[in-house]
Protein backbone atom coordinates (compact mmCIF):
# COMPACT_ATOMS: atom_id res chain seq x y z
CA UNK A 1 0.00 0.00 0.00
CA UNK A 2 1.39 3.41 -0.88
CA UNK A 3 1.09 6.85 0.73
CA UNK A 4 -1.38 8.13 -1.89
CA UNK A 5 -3.78 5.22 -1.31
CA UNK A 6 -3.75 5.64 2.46
CA UNK A 7 -4.03 9.42 2.46
CA UNK A 8 -6.89 9.43 -0.05
CA UNK A 9 -8.98 7.40 2.42
CA UNK A 10 -8.77 10.15 5.06
CA UNK A 11 -11.74 12.51 5.11
CA UNK A 12 -10.46 16.06 4.72
CA UNK A 13 -13.00 17.39 7.24
CA UNK A 14 -11.54 15.13 9.94
CA UNK A 15 -7.90 15.65 9.02
CA UNK A 16 -5.94 17.71 11.56
CA UNK A 17 -2.39 16.61 10.74
CA UNK A 18 -2.27 18.17 7.24
CA UNK A 19 -0.73 14.93 6.09
CA UNK A 20 -3.24 14.32 3.32
CA UNK A 21 -2.03 14.58 -0.27
CA UNK A 22 -4.71 17.22 -0.99
CA UNK A 23 -4.22 19.20 2.21
CA UNK A 24 -2.75 22.66 1.84
CA UNK A 25 0.03 23.70 4.15
CA UNK A 26 2.75 22.02 6.16
CA UNK A 27 2.77 18.97 8.35
CA UNK A 28 2.61 19.46 12.11
CA UNK A 29 6.27 18.77 12.71
CA UNK A 30 7.30 21.23 10.00
CA UNK A 31 5.05 23.93 11.46
CA UNK A 32 6.41 23.39 14.95
CA UNK A 33 10.01 23.46 13.70
CA UNK A 34 9.37 26.67 11.76
CA UNK A 35 7.71 28.26 14.80
CA UNK A 36 10.74 27.35 16.94
CA UNK A 37 13.18 28.84 14.42
CA UNK A 38 11.11 32.02 14.07
CA UNK A 39 10.85 32.42 17.86
CA UNK A 40 14.64 32.13 18.14
CA UNK A 41 15.15 34.54 15.21
CA UNK A 42 16.94 31.83 13.24
CA UNK A 43 15.45 32.20 9.78
CA UNK A 44 16.24 35.56 8.17
CA UNK A 45 19.68 35.53 6.50
CA UNK A 46 20.65 32.21 8.11
CA UNK A 47 22.33 29.19 6.51
CA UNK A 48 20.14 26.15 7.17
CA UNK A 49 20.66 22.54 6.11
CA UNK A 50 17.86 20.00 6.28
CA UNK A 51 19.08 16.40 6.27
CA UNK A 52 16.18 14.34 4.93
CA UNK A 53 13.78 14.70 2.04
CA UNK A 54 10.58 13.25 3.42
CA UNK A 55 7.10 14.70 3.07
CA UNK A 56 7.32 16.34 6.49
CA UNK A 57 10.14 18.70 5.52
CA UNK A 58 9.47 19.50 1.87
CA UNK A 59 7.30 22.51 2.65
CA UNK A 60 9.54 23.49 5.56
CA UNK A 61 12.39 24.09 3.10
CA UNK A 62 10.10 26.23 0.96
CA UNK A 63 8.90 28.38 3.87
CA UNK A 64 12.42 28.83 5.22
CA UNK A 65 13.47 30.08 1.78
CA UNK A 66 10.53 32.49 1.74
CA UNK A 67 11.80 33.76 5.10
CA UNK A 68 15.10 34.66 3.41
CA UNK A 69 17.09 31.71 4.74
CA UNK A 70 19.60 29.96 2.53
CA UNK A 71 18.43 26.35 2.56
CA UNK A 72 20.31 23.22 1.57
CA UNK A 73 18.45 19.91 1.47
CA UNK A 74 20.72 16.89 1.87
CA UNK A 75 19.79 13.21 1.84
CA UNK A 76 21.17 9.70 1.52
CA UNK A 77 22.42 10.33 -2.03
CA UNK A 78 24.17 13.62 -1.22
CA UNK A 79 27.82 13.22 -2.22
CA UNK A 80 29.24 15.02 0.81
CA UNK A 81 26.97 15.21 3.82
CA UNK A 82 29.97 16.53 5.71
CA UNK A 83 30.23 19.52 3.39
CA UNK A 84 26.46 20.08 3.36
CA UNK A 85 26.34 20.35 7.16
CA UNK A 86 29.60 22.19 7.76
CA UNK A 87 29.47 25.75 9.14
CA UNK A 88 25.69 26.15 9.09
CA UNK A 89 23.66 28.27 11.49
CA UNK A 90 21.02 25.56 11.81
CA UNK A 91 21.08 21.87 10.92
CA UNK A 92 17.77 20.00 10.98
CA UNK A 93 18.03 16.22 10.98
CA UNK A 94 14.76 14.75 9.73
CA UNK A 95 15.98 11.22 9.23
CA UNK A 96 15.89 8.27 11.62
CA UNK A 97 19.57 7.42 11.26
CA UNK A 98 22.71 9.18 10.16
CA UNK A 99 24.90 6.81 8.19
CA UNK A 100 27.50 9.22 6.81
CA UNK A 101 29.94 11.70 8.29
CA UNK A 102 28.31 14.83 9.66
CA UNK A 103 29.75 18.11 10.83
CA UNK A 104 28.59 20.60 13.40
CA UNK A 105 30.27 23.12 15.58
CA UNK A 106 29.34 25.01 18.71
CA UNK A 107 27.55 27.78 16.84
CA UNK A 108 25.18 25.38 15.14
CA UNK A 109 21.64 24.90 16.35
CA UNK A 110 20.95 21.22 15.80
CA UNK A 111 17.33 20.09 15.68
CA UNK A 112 17.08 16.31 15.69
CA UNK A 113 13.61 15.18 14.66
CA UNK A 114 14.59 11.62 15.49
CA UNK A 115 17.22 10.47 17.92
CA UNK A 116 20.24 10.02 15.69
CA UNK A 117 22.62 12.92 16.26
CA UNK A 118 25.25 12.86 19.02
CA UNK A 119 25.28 16.67 19.46
CA UNK A 120 25.34 17.61 23.18
CA UNK A 121 23.23 20.77 22.80
CA UNK A 122 20.70 19.63 20.24
CA UNK A 123 16.97 20.21 20.42
CA UNK A 124 16.02 16.56 20.50
CA UNK A 125 12.51 15.68 19.44
CA UNK A 126 12.43 11.89 19.59
CA UNK A 127 9.45 10.13 18.14
CA UNK A 128 7.78 6.80 18.63
CA UNK A 129 6.17 5.24 15.57
CA UNK A 130 6.88 8.46 13.63
CA UNK A 131 5.01 10.68 16.11
CA UNK A 132 7.18 13.13 18.03
CA UNK A 133 6.64 15.70 20.75
CA UNK A 134 6.39 18.60 18.31
CA UNK A 135 3.79 16.75 16.27
CA UNK A 136 1.74 15.76 19.31
CA UNK A 137 1.64 19.31 20.69
CA UNK A 138 0.53 20.80 17.38
CA UNK A 139 -2.07 18.07 16.82
CA UNK A 140 -3.57 18.54 20.28
CA UNK A 141 -3.73 22.28 19.70
CA UNK A 142 -5.48 21.81 16.35
CA UNK A 143 -7.88 19.24 17.77
CA UNK A 144 -8.81 21.56 20.65
CA UNK A 145 -9.43 24.47 18.27
CA UNK A 146 -11.49 22.28 15.94
CA UNK A 147 -13.61 20.97 18.84
CA UNK A 148 -14.06 24.51 20.17
CA UNK A 149 -15.46 25.66 16.80
CA UNK A 150 -18.06 22.86 16.64
Language-model-detected regions and their locations in the chain:
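Conserved active-site and cofactor/substrate-binding residues in soluble primary-metabolism enzymes
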Residues: 1, 28-32, 86, 131-141
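Acidic-glycine-rich active-site phosphate/pyrophosphate-binding loop
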Residues: 6, 11-12, 114-122
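Gly/Ser/Thr-rich helix-start
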Residues: 55, 115, 131-133
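Adenosine-phosphate binding glycine-rich loop
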Residues: 121-150
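General beta-strand structural signal in soluble alpha/beta enzymes
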Residues: 17-21, 26, 73-74, 112, ...
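Phosphate/diphosphate ligand-binding glycine-rich loop within oxidoreductases
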Residues: 1-27
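Glycine-rich phosphate/diphosphate-binding loop of Rossmann-like nucleotide-binding domains
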Residues: 25-100, 105-109, 118-122
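Short glycine-rich anion-binding loops that position phosphate/pyrophosphate groups of nucleotides
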Residues: 1, 96-98, 116-117, 134
Amino acid sequence: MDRETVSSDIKLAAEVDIDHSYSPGMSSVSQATLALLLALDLVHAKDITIVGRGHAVQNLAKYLTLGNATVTVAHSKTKSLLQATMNRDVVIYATPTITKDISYNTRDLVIDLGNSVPHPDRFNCPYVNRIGQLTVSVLLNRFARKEHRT
